[in-house]
Swiss-Prot record:
The chain crosses the membrane at residues 8-28. Residues 29-328 are periplasmic. It comes from the Bacteria. It holds the Pfam family T2SSK. Cleaved by prepilin peptidase. Its main location: membrane. Belongs to the GSP K family. NCBIfam families: T2SS_GspK (NF037980). It comes from Pectobacterium carotovorum subsp. carotovorum. One of its GO terms (biological process) is protein secretion. Keywords: Cell inner membrane, Cell membrane, Membrane, Protein transport, Transmembrane, Transmembrane helix, Transport. This is Type II secretion system protein K.
Length: 328
């Protein structure tokens, strides 16, 4: 009898011990996970503050360059240095400032250069966008349809233009949605426009942007040879892409001081004076700041849009996480 009691007691002790070990293991696991979550959260918060500091520094660099050379913005200034890296406690910041006047602003597509687009059947910016598509390999018919669809996406009405697409087209899709009928707040919206697939989006992405203004302006002093398809389209393809590359190659090291100086070079197409004066610029006021911060094992991405007005820099937009992604 006593032997059985001892066996039962031993079994109870073993069960209690097993239960205690299980509870201890669960507590240890949960504590470890909580610690990792806390550590990850703290690293992300630290990385965010580093990014905001780098953003402020970027604005100061732009201000300094503007003070040193108030009349122009050109490749070779401090802001344009590629692959900037800054070591910080526990990690590293990498960043790049880019001129937002080296891309086609899709929000200008419905506007004439002087906001008189309502008087024009096909506004000049829409012609530029259509020719940019052609320069990137699109057929004329598809380029016209996509241009019309982008115009309908942004315009305020629900009346489709010729070859365009409004709510009725999007409502018939397998996953229906509606047009924005307002400015694009981010260039990734372009992927939602009818007719723009992932392949075209990838090809367009380096040449387009979405700025919070309706004006179209291209800084001739910061374009690269890669931007030849856009520069050619700006002159309605009266300038070939080879000529556009040659124009960039012959640009002075500190850029052109004014459009008048550029026009005197003879590098522009004949009868292009009006286009140059209305669209081209030698100075920029919009800049993208792309930042990546690594703290420990955490990566933090931030993309900011800065507006430089005189000596004042304003942060107009911030995006955290991934940016300029391509959906399937």
């Amino acid at each position: 009898m006593r032997s059985r009691q001892r066996g039962a007691a031993l079994l109870v002790v073993l069960l209690i011990l097993a239960l205690m070990v299980t509870i201890a293991a669960v507590i240890t696991e949960r504590t470890g996970k909580a610690f990792l979550r806390t550590e990850s959260h703290l690293s992300r918060q630290q990385a965010k503050w580093y990014a905001l500091g780098a953003e402020t520094l970027s604005g100061q660099i732009l201000q300094r360059d503007a003070r040193n050379m108030p009349g122009r913005t050109f490749a070779g200034q401090n802001w344009s240095q590629p692959g900037l890296r800054f070591p910080v406690d526990g990690g590293e910041i990498t960043g790049q400032i880019s001129d937002a006047r080296t891309c086609f602003n899709v929000n200008a597509i419905n506007q004439g250069v002087d906001n008189e687009s309502t008087l024009v059947k096909t506004p000049y910016p829409a012609q530029v966008f259509r020719l940019l598509l052609k320069n990137l390999g699109e057929e004329t018919d598809r380029a016209e349809k996509i241009t019309a669809a982008v115009r309908d996406w942004i315009d305020a009405d629900n009346y489709p233009s010729a070859n365009g697409a409004e709510d009725d087209v999007y409502a018939a899709l397998p996953v229906p949605y509606r047009t924005a009928n307002q400015r694009m707040s981010e260039i990734s919206e372009l992927r939602s426009v009818y007719g723009i697939d992932s392949d075209l989006y990838r090809r367009l992405l380096p040449y387009v942007c979405a700025l919070p203004v309706d004006a179209m302006s291209i800084n001739i002093n910061t374009l690269t040879e890669f931007d030849a398809p856009l520069l050619s389209a700006v002159f309605l393809n009266e300038m070939t892409m080879s000529q556009a590359k040659a124009l960039v190659q012959q640009r002075p090291r500190m850029g052109w001081a004014s459009l008048e100086v550029l026009q005197q070079t003879g590098l522009l197409p004949p009868n292009s004076k009006n286009t140059a004066q209305r669209v081209l610029a030698v100075k920029s006021e919009w800049f993208f700041v792309k930042l990546q911060v690594r703290v420990g094992d955490s990566d933090f991405h931030q993309r900011s849009l800065l507006h430089l007005s005189g000596q004042k820099v304003q942060v107009v937009q911030r995006q955290y996480g991934g940016y300029r992604t391509v959906n399937p």
